[in-house]
């Protein structure tokens, strides 16, 4: 699913009808402004989904210099949190800092981390299993609250939160099985 698909869906839900948002020449000034606002909302909502519900996990071969790995050297430097650092088959301890991670060795390793997308545009492909209609509800809620449309924002946010909770419950993530004990 592309960002443009989400924004097209938002245009329909906001009452503008079916509009090709990728054709910038045929958009009015108001529609162009709305596309820019909705693009920012897509970034905010998708970042929340990645950070809180469904992480976008990346794995990368890296080189630690002086026992440090600078985030700026990664393919995607917008890191949310580190998951693991492996040297061969062995998982090594890491300590996260704002601009780098530190470990107890220097050299080659495999780094696994949760990251945000580097940038958002109409042609950006969104990873994950969140359907377009659900992401659109979150974007509309974000847009509505920013423009003081409280009722519309509350309705869209309710649908978004319920949909995310249902999707997370069915994805197998977050399930907790109570430990059983022998009597």
Annotate each predicted stretch with a short phrase.
Residues 1-183:
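Glycine-enriched, solvent-exposed interface loops adjoining structured elements
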């Amino acid at each position: 699913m592309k960002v443009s698909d989400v924004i097209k869906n938002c245009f329909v839900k906001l009452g503008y009808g079916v509009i090709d948002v990728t054709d910038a020449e045929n958009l009015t000034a108001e529609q162009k402004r709305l596309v820019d606002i909705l693009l920012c909302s897509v970034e905010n909502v998708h970042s929340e989904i990645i950070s809180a519900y469904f992480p976008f996990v990346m794995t990368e071969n890296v080189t630690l210099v002086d026992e440090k790995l600078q985030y700026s050297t990664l393919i995607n430097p917008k890191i949310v949190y580190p998951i693991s650092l492996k040297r061969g088959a062995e998982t090594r301890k890491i300590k996260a800092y704002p601009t780098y991670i530190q470990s107890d060795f220097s050299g080659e390793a495999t780094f696994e981390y949760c990251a945000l997308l580097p940038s958002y545009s109409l042609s950006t492909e969104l990873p994950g299993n969140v359907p377009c209609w659900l992401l659109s509800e979150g974007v509309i809620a974000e847009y509505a609250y920013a423009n003081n449309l409280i009722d519309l924002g509350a309705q869209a946010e309710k649908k978004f939160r319920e949909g995310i909770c249902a999707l997370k419950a069915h994805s197998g993530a977050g399930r907790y099985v109570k430990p059983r004990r022998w009597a």
